[in-house]
Amino acid sequence: MGLTKTLEEYIKMYEKHTKEKFQFNTSFSFFYHPEHGFCEYKIEDTGLYIWQLCGDLKYWVDIGYKVCQQFQLPAMSAYILRHSKPFIRKLGFKIVKTEHEDSYYRFTCKNKAGEELVATQHGDKYIFVWKIEVKDNDSTDV
């Protein structure tokens, strides 16, 4: 069993790193895990949307992939308030294309499986969008 934190401890950590006051977003569902942090999310036809997140990013992204597969969602996006390049590396992606225009950067990334992630920076905020290859849930393969 890993290191656990209370929700209050994760919220303090979130506020310290983001320099923003944490407030529950009533438009999103909320999930907390003592070893992995917390995540606010919303499921819509167009994809899975992750709003406020603190803790183990890799854990929450892995959960997100599973949710996208289960509900056959084509994309997952996350709002990130920290520098994007360390997150890109931690998630196993490499930047294959960089675009810069005015006050934003966009990084197109791929991982070893060929999956795509686009990270767009505007000021200090980042939007990560993963394209999800939906697997056929009706497959009879054993």
Annotated model-derived regions:
Residues 52-57, 111-112, 122, 130-136:
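Secondary-structure transition/turn motif
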Residues 20-21, 28-31, 92-99, 117:
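Short secondary-structure junctions
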Residues 15-47:
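A conserved beta-strand-loop-helix scaffold within acyl/acetyltransferase catalytic domains
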